Design a protein with these regions (language model features):
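A sequence-level/structural motif corresponding to short, flexible coil/turn segments enriched
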Residues: 63-415
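Primarily marks secretory-pathway-exposed extracellular/lumenal segments that are disulfide-
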Residues: 4-71, 75, 397, 407-414
């Protein structure tokens, strides 16, 4: 028995000494006998360490002094001036898909959760893709328009269904002769159909906003048009918990004088109510999202200076509040809005201002970013991803970009 106890003690101390020895011989990278210096090795990071030989994941990034998780840019054509991005969505696998255009062809880009590109596809039969969704079968549906190169061509709306790798499963172009039609947004409804909104022009100068419903195989179920003046357009669309449809855009004349336009229909596209709001100068709505109270909040611009604008309506269409944020310089309007999980809303405007407001529309912070100005989403972990760089009023295009940030880090910095 004594010999056995002695043996156990010898083995214990041998193991203990070996463990200590191993610890002493490993460097910060975990390499036996190594001499790595751990730190941030990314030269663009704010805490880049020129002496570091091993990246330990501690890199921090700043954009205009604001902490961000990462910023990625993607160039598809030979000249980034010909690349556009309009919409970004999160995907079932944690990655992202961007819809846009490259060299006048519709474009989809798929990335992993870190923003690294996995694939991109361009679509010869389209000119631009304004919106994209991932649907229940794991594929993607995107919409926009197609216009041929001839002088006598007019744009037609375009609807595309792909598999999970962006390969075409079916595509549709539709419109009227010698008139302009395009689609700006698409959703998948609870009954697994597709609904799009945009512009339909079937009698010359009088353009109408439209809703069109398709099966998931691309078969048209119904088509409805809506107008309040001679020029009307649907820009963004949503379905509520009652399976009703709400779209926003503008109503005005072919020469301007646009007014905010919001229409609610039943699930078959039959109008329940429509609302128009006037402003001094042009005014229109680019985006809509649900409110916790069951209503809707829409974002766009107002007045001759194209100031940022928000309006909230209840489920019956009654106005709850609105605000035209007049600034010293034109901001060209909010282009996207998303509900925040901790209350209030996040927005992005044309000049790349990232804004957080409370439930009453009061601004909590307004931060100037760069590179992104069209589309914003909140992830399950509370991080924000912003994408888009297109040909809007305040810029002339630029590299397709995707940015991820943690709002809590902004809150801490602003305290």
């Amino acid at each position: 028995m004594e010999n056995m106890n002695y043996y156990k003690k010898v083995m214990y101390f041998t193991f203990f000494l070996a463990s200590c020895e191993d610890t002493e011989l490993k460097d910060c990278a975990g390499v036996d006998g190594g001499n790595a210096i751990c730190g941030c090795t990314d030269i663009v990071a704010s805490n880049f360490d020129s002496l570091a030989t091993f990246d330990d994941g501690s890199c921090e990034y700043l954009l205009n002094g604001i902490p961000i998780e990462w910023l990625k840019t993607y160039q598809v054509s030979n000249n980034s001036y010909y690349d556009e991005s309009w919409k970004v969505i999160s995907t079932f696998d944690g990655g992202f898909v961007i819809a846009g255009a490259s060299d006048y062809k519709g474009l989809l880009i798929k990335t992993d959760p870190a923003g690294e590109k996995e694939w991109h596809q361009t679509y010869e039969n389209s000119t631009t893709l304004y919106s994209v969704i991932e649907i229940s079968d794991g594929g993607y549906v995107a919409t926009g328009y197609y216009e041929c190169d001839d002088m006598d061509c007019y744009p037609d709306l375009y609807l595309l269904k792909t598999d999970s790798e962006g390969a075409v499963e079916w595509e549709i172009s539709d419109g009227t002769e010698e008139n302009n039609e395009w689609a700006k947004d698409v959703i998948e409804t609870d009954d697994e159909h597709l609904v799009i909104t945009g512009v339909w022009n079937d009698d010359g100068w009088n353009s109408k906003a439209f809703l069109r419903k398709y099966t998931k195989n691309g078969e048209l179920v119904w088509h409805k048009t809506f107008s309040n003046s001679t020029a009307n357009e649907g820009n963004a669309l949503m379905e509520n918990s009652d399976n009703e449809l709400i779209f926003v855009g503008y109503s005005g004349t072919q020469h301007g004088s646009y007014n905010h336009y919001m229409v609610k229909t039943d699930s078959d596209g039959n109008q329940i109510w429509k609302k128009k709001a006037q402003s001094i100068g042009d005014a229109l709505l680019h985006s809509i999202c649900p409110t916790p109270s069951g209503g809707f909040i829409a974002a766009g611009f107002c007045n001759s200076f194209r100031s940022n604008y928000l309006i909230e309506r209840n489920n019956s269409g009654g106005k709850v509040w609105e605000d035209c944020f007049i600034d010293e310089t034109s901001r060209y309007g909010y282009y996207d809005i998303v509900l925040s999980s901790d209350g209030g809303y996040f927005l992005i405007d044309e000049l790349s201002h990232f804004v957080k407001i409370d439930a009453n529309g009061d601004i909590l912070y307004d931060i100037k970013l760069n590179h992104v100005n069209q589309s914003i989403i909140e992830l399950e972990d509370g991080d924000i991803v912003i994408g888009g760089y297109g040909f809007r009023e305040g810029n002339s295009g630029g590299p397709i970009s995707l940015l991820r940030l943690n709002p809590s880090r902004i809150n801490n910095k602003l305290k």
